[in-house]
Design a protein with these regions (language model features):
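Sensory modules in modular signal-transduction proteins
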Residues: 1-35
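Sensory/regulatory domains in signal-transduction proteins
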Residues: 33-121
Length: 124
């Protein structure tokens, strides 16, 4: 069974921005939430562009250091990078690996600390 369509659907339905990058720091995928979040920076038009062009030199240095750390061990897969108090959100970088455990890319993971405001089982 090809699970790719299922995995893509998980990403497409996520309300948090998901931006996937390859090891050359090229943005290879943005989910709809990411396209909306980064709309003022060209949104979906960022696909194919370098993530490093979206950050300052200090941030780029940190990104490079994290990717290097991911490459040192198959066990190095997630690192906490910041807390965004404005959005009450933790930010992580997460390694992407192939079936053999080889590093193939990375993404930034957002986890919001806010309590859910949606009503339970609200079948509108």
């Amino acid at each position: 069974m090809n699970l790719n369509v299922y995995f893509k659907s998980v990403l497409e339905q996520d309300t948090a921005a998901v931006v996937l990058c390859n090891l050359e720091h090229e943005i290879i995928y943005m989910n709809p939430a990411a396209k909306t979040r980064y709309a003022k920076h060209s949104g979906g038009n960022l696909v194919g562009k370098s993530l490093l062009n979206c950050h300052n030199p200090k941030s780029n240095e940190k990104i490079e250091k994290v990717v290097e750390w991911f490459g040192k061990s198959k066990d190095n897969n997630i690192i906490y990078t910041s807390f965004n108090p404005k959005e009450n959100m933790d930010v992580y970088m997460v390694a992407l690996r192939d079936d053999g455990g080889n590093l193939i890319g990375y993404y930034e993971k957002h986890e919001y600390r806010n309590n859910e405001t949606m009503k339970k089982y609200d079948f509108k």
